[in-house]
Swiss-Prot record:
A Gene Ontology cellular-component term: nucleus
Gene: noc
InterPro entries: Elbow/Noc_ZnFinger (IPR051520), Znf_C2H2_type (IPR013087)
Free-text function comment from the UniProt entry: May negatively regulate Notch-induced cell proliferation in the eye-head primordium. Required for development of the supraesophageal ganglion and ocelli. May act in leg and wing primordia to negatively regulate body-wall specifying genes and thereby promote appendage formation. Plays a role in tracheal development.
Polar residues: compositionally biased ranges: 138-177, 188-206
UniProt entry keywords in alphabetical sequence: Developmental protein, DNA-binding, Metal-binding, Notch signaling pathway, Phosphoprotein, Zinc, Zinc-finger
A Gene Ontology biological process term: terminal branching, open tracheal system
Sites of Phosphoserine modification: S98, S157, S208
Subunit structure: Interacts with elB.
Signal peptide limits: none
Protein name: Zinc finger protein Noc
Length: 537
């Protein structure tokens, strides 16, 4: 244990199991011992690792400082006029100030300035794991440092002439636990500020040659002093956000944003990743999400897969625009991506210029063929022809919304008109024949013959014409294009070809065009033509 004797008081430093500075002796007060750099270094090093909680005053305070008062400072003195216990009645002349009170380690124009500093010493307590910046301030800059009140500071010790007492410094006030917890400090330029006292007491913090600690340098490299807890919390939050962003993949917090289409598309544009209903659970949906999270779905990264392969579902095609120019557009070939703006089907449906039905010279037909070729299929392929027919029928449905649904037996008119007047005038051509008795009798005989066929022959004999509803709008065309597992395929499907999907002869353009009005469904005989033909031979 080391006992440091000062003028009028004794301060003891408690036992420390890590550091026993028994070799230190009280510094002599002669000459300029407190001003020399060696003395400052010795005082600084003696307080490294010291525990401020073990500091206890051994002598009672002086009687003339028992009541708290206001510490008034003169405008011409270099330091403030004492601690918070000095009464306001004392004049600056009554307190003989020594020039030694303005040393670099004295209080920075604050409390605990020494009234008789010839025998007083300032002990600086430094803890390497307690973040605190004690910058060298001018003694006239006290009023500009009020922002440091809420910042916990490093405990320091002050030795005054009348009371040698060591208390931890917590704020810029000047009071001890025996002072009632209040202090009033007057600044040099008549700018006073009232500050509360922390529970453990406070003393004025002074300038110190001690550099920053390692934790502060790491947490606060830009020089702005902040609380270590605040710095650690902000650093933890930033690290957590960065980790979440990196763990989410190259597309930020949503790793599913580019599974179907290029970046910027809707995250659930792919129906494979869309839940079946709100709040429901689907094993397929969960499996697709798991595969996407593991990077197994093609196109899950900007380069495609984990190895950086290009996305197999995205291709670029140069097409002719309706204005006559050329444009390079991305095309999404994902079969599950129907609502994506890059889908060929969506782009075909968006082409809304008027076009008559069956037109092969308009831009719609060329655009459909270009989209089919962009999908990697030749123009003569059944799928390409069906896509072109579907695009043409969709354009015709927008340009001519009025359709004649007149049916006589299995004959369906199906003509389209742009206005209702044209449709009404066309209907007169059908109803005009009924006014003739001979035409009406012929139509009645035809309908009776159709009903007689249905009674004489069983349905199994008419299986090739399945289904044949008598008044179906698409009975004849849909029967040719609709697939039935037991029906004999059309003659064109028997012709084999080198293509695994069947030759071009296995596709019926008329049937595909008729079926395209019902939706983008293609003839199944084009794919299974060879096997079905071999089975029926």
């Amino acid at each position: 244990m080391v006992v440091l004797e000062g003028g009028g008081g004794v301060v003891t430093i408690g036992n420390n199991q890590y550091l026993q500075p028994d070799y230190l002796a009280p510094l002599p007060t002669t000459m300029d011992a407190k001003k020399s750099p060696l003395a400052l270094l010795a005082q600084t090093c003696s307080q490294i690792g010291a525990d401020s909680s073990a500091v206890k005053p051994l002598l009672a305070m002086d009687k003339n400082k028992t009541k708290p008062g206001a510490c008034s400072s003169s405008s011409n003195s270099s330091s403030s006029s004492g601690s918070a216990e000095i009464s306001a009645a004392k004049s600056p002349s009554g307190q003989a100030k020594s020039p030694k009170s303005s040393t670099p380690i004295s209080s920075t124009a604050t409390s605990a300035s020494l009234s008789n500093t010839s025998t007083g010493e300032i002990k600086l307590a430094f803890k390497p794991y307690e973040t605190n910046v004690l910058s060298h301030q001018n003694q006239n800059s006290f009023k500009s440092s009020s922002s440091l009140d809420a910042e916990p500071t490093r405990p320091s010790s002050k030795n005054s002439s009348s009371a040698q007492e060591r208390v931890p410094s917590r704020s810029k006030s000047n009071a001890t636990p025996t002072d009632g917890g209040k202090a009033e400090i007057s600044a040099h330029d008549s700018s006073s500020s009232r500050k509360t006292v922390s529970p453990s007491g406070s003393s004025q913090r002074g300038a110190s040659p001690i550099v920053r600690s390692g934790m502060e340098v790491l947490n606060n490299a830009n020089g702005t002093a902040q609380h270590p807890k605040e710095m650690s919390s902000m650093a933890a939050a930033a690290a957590a956000a960065a980790a979440a962003y990196k763990a989410a993949g190259p597309y930020g917090l949503n790793p599913l944003s580019a599974l179907c289409c290029p970046p910027g598309m809707e995250q659930h544009a792919n129906p494979a990743f869309r839940p079946p209903f709100a709040g429901g659970f689907s094993h397929h949906h969960a499996a697709m999400l798991a595969v996407a999270a593991n990077g197994g779905y093609p196109g899950g990264a900007p380069g495609g897969g984990p190895a950086g392969q290009p996305n197999p579902y995205i291709s670029y095609q140069r097409i002719k625009t309706p204005a006559g120019g050329e444009a390079i557009v991305p095309v999404c070939k994902d079969p599950y991506c129907q609502g994506c703006p890059y889908s060929a089907h969506t782009q075909q449906m968006l082409m809304g210029a008027p076009c008559p039905a069956g037109c092969t010279q308009c831009e719609h037909q060329k655009y459909g063929l270009a989209m089919a070729s962009a999908a990697g299929l030749p123009p003569a392929h059944p799928y390409s022809q069906a896509a072109a027919a579907a695009a043409a029928n969709a354009a015709a449905a927008r340009s001519a919304p009025y359709v004649c649904s007149w049916v006589v037996g299995d004959a369906y008119c199906g003509k389209r008109f742009q206005t209702s007047d044209e449709l009404f005038s066309h209907l007169r051509t059908h109803t005009g024949n009924l006014s003739d008795p001979a035409a009406a009798a012929a139509a009645l005989a035809q309908s009776q013959a159709q009903s007689l066929l249905g009674t004489l022959f069983p349905p199994s004999a008419l299986r090739a014409g399945y289904p044949t509803p008598p008044l179906s709008p698409m009975s004849a065309a849909a029967a040719a294009a609709r697939y039935h597992p037991y029906a004999k395929p059309p003659p064109g499907a028997l012709a084999g070809g080198p293509s695994p999907f069947g030759a071009a002869g296995a596709f019926n353009p008329a049937a595909a065009a008729a079926a395209a009005a019902l939706g983008p469904y293609y003839s199944p005989y084009a794919m299974y033509g060879q096997r079905m033909g071999a089975a029926h031979q």
